[in-house]
Structure formats: structure tokens, C-alpha cells
From Swiss-Prot:
GO terms for biological process: CMP-keto-3-deoxy-D-manno-octulosonic acid biosynthetic process; lipopolysaccharide biosynthetic process. One of its GO terms (cellular component) is cytosol. Pathway: Nucleotide-sugar biosynthesis; CMP-3-deoxy-D-manno-octulosonate biosynthesis; CMP-3-deoxy-D-manno-octulosonate from 3-deoxy-D-manno-octulosonate and CTP: step 1/1; Bacterial outer membrane biogenesis; lipopolysaccharide biosynthesis. Keywords: Cytoplasm, Lipopolysaccharide biosynthesis, Nucleotidyltransferase, Transferase. Belongs to the KdsB family. It is found in: Cytoplasm. Its EC number is 2.7.7.38. One of its GO terms (molecular function) is 3-deoxy-manno-octulosonate cytidylyltransferase activity. Its main location: cytoplasm. It comes from the Bacteria. It comes from Ralstonia nicotianae (strain ATCC BAA-1114 / GMI1000) (Ralstonia solanacearum). It catalyses: 3-deoxy-alpha-D-manno-oct-2-ulosonate + CTP = CMP-3-deoxy-beta-D-manno-octulosonate + diphosphate. The keyword Methyltransferase does not apply. This is 3-deoxy-manno-octulosonate cytidylyltransferase.
Length: 268
């Protein structure tokens, strides 16, 4: 893989229905969004920018010497927010922008690097993302776990919340009568989508003009809009599942408990 320069952008919305003020939640003495940015700085990114619609988040970033860009508050998605950043920063069309989720303070810097490199190495694709094999049957049947199937060139054929592909021989009526956790794993690995994306800046600027796709609206998966309009998505398959992000107070407690171990490895 080629590790050419790229920019990491971290969208951070203050509003959260399940965890209010999530970007500012304290993790080891610093706001979560700052912890995410610090992890991104450990990657090969030439620049790390937090994109937020909240002055309080931008101020917190600047207090910790993290670059922040204030964006509009009416964006329908994180990708729309990235599109504004690409325009504000006047990024060249061939620039690679990695969308690092603002609620993943334990993200591996190598994953950021590898997704950027994967897009660089797939000139026919506008987007790159990642996936890993699912090893628990319950996850295959969990609609909150997004699955992806690939073609021979490691490009996405489809993303879905449904079990994908459907293992006809393994999931007989008798097997489906069992609890999801006890159903057999199919012979073909089922891949779980990892929510990190690399984009070409030219595509980001086009994205807000793309009409929403019926499949996107049905599945509530934003990446399906790009595929609906003919864009290709390169998928990096990794053996390791990334650390889970923070969506709830319970997630936050888990991450805080894990943080001391991370600090002992990486330093403060």
C-alpha cells in the first residue's frame, strides 16, 4: 500500500439523543473529540481537522491545539459536513480525506493509514472503507451490524443490515429455529462493515448534489447513495475488529475503563 499524504477530518456534532454533549465527554482529562484527534495525529495524516457546528467544541479543540473548522448546523449527514470542509479548505480534487468518527477515541492509527492507502491504490474508486470477518452468529442477524459483500476486485457489491450473503445450506428452517447466537456460521465469511471512510475531495464536493436513493432510505445507510449513483467503493478487509465507539453512557464507561491501559502503552 502507498502511504501518500492525506487529511483526516473528524465530524463532531454536539447534539446527540443518546449521549448529550458527546464530543465534550471527558476521557482521561480531555474531551473525547480531542482524544480522537490525538489518535488521528498518530497516523500518517498530513493534517487533522475537527469539523463541528458547535463553538464550544471548536473552542475545546483549540485549547488543546487541535485545528477546528466551524460548519453549518443544517447538514443532513457527516459526509455533507465533510463536503463543506473540502470546499472551505480548498482541497485539490485528488486530495484524499479520511472521515474519522468523532466517537471512536480508541481507533487504531494504522487503520486510518490503511484505509487512505487503500483508496490511493484503487484509482477507479471514489471511496474506500473497511470490513472484518464476523465471528459471532448473533452479529450476523443483528440489524445494527452492517454487512458488506465484495467483488473479486475488493469493491463493495452491497451493504445491508440484513444477513448478507444468505447462507441457504447453513440456515435451514431447523437452524433458524435456534436462537441467533446458536445458529451455524456459514462457510463463506460474512464481513462486518467498519464505519471509517476515505474519499477523494472531488467526490465529496459532488455528494451534496446527489439525490437520496430509495435503497439508502430503506436501509438508512448513507454509503448506498454513492453506489446507487454508480460510484465504486473499495473495501479493505482486516482480520481485527476495531474497538467499539461511544453511543451510550455505558459505552463511555467502558472506554474510560480501557483508557488507562491505552495510556500505559502510548503515553498521555
Amino acid at each position: 500500500m502507498s502511504h501518500a499524504p492525506f487529511i483526516a477530518v473528524i465530524p463532531a456534532r454536539l447534539a446527540s439523543t443518546r449521549l448529550p454533549n458527546k464530543p465534550l465527554a471527558d476521557i482521561g482529562g480531555k474531551p473525547m473529540v480531542v482524544r480522537v484527534a490525538e489518535r488521528a495525529h498518530q497516523s500518517s495524516a498530513a493534517r487533522v481537522v475537527v469539523a463541528t457546528d458547535a463553538v464550544s467544541v471548536a473552542d475545546a479543540c483549540m485549547q488543546h491545539h487541535i485545528e477546528a473548522v466551524l460548519t453549518r448546523a443544517d447538514h443532513a449527514s457527516g459526509t455533507d459536513r465533510l463536503a463543506e470542509v473540502a470546499t472551505v479548505l480548498a482541497l485539490p480534487d485528488d486530495a484524499i480525506v479520511v472521515n474519522v468518527q468523532g466517537d471512536e477515541p480508541l481507533i487504531a492509527p494504522t487503520l486510518i493509514d490503511n484505509v487512505a492507502a487503500h483508496l490511493r491504490d484503487h484509482a477507479d474508486c471514489a471511496i474506500a472503507t473497511a470490513a472484518h470477518p464476523i465471528r459471532a452468529a448473533a452479529d450476523i442477524f443483528n440489524p445494527n451490524v452492517v454487512k458488506v459483500v465484495l467483488d473479486a476486485a475488493e469493491r463493495a457489491l452491497l451493504f445491508s443490515r440484513a444477513p448478507l450473503p444468505w447462507a441457504r445450506d447453513a440456515w435451514t428452517p431447523a437452524a433458524l429455529d435456534q436462537p441467533a447466537a446458536e445458529r451455524p456460521l456459514p462457510a463463506m465469511p460474512v464481513l462486518r462493515h467498519i464505519g471509517i471512510y476515505a474519499y477523494r475531495a472531488a467526490f465529496l464536493r459532488r455528494f451534496p448534489q446527489l439525490a437520496a436513493a430509495p435503497l439508502e432510505q430503506t436501509e438508512q445507510l448513507e454509503q448506498l447513495r454513492a453506489m446507487w449513483h454508480g460510484e465504486r467503493i473499495a473495501v479493505l478487509t482486516t482480520d481485527d475488529a476495531p474497538a467499539a465507539g461511544v453511543d451510550t453512557a455505558e459505552d463511555l464507561a467502558r472506554v474510560r475503563a480501557a483508557w488507562s491501559d491505552l495510556l500505559s502503552q502510548d503515553g498521555p
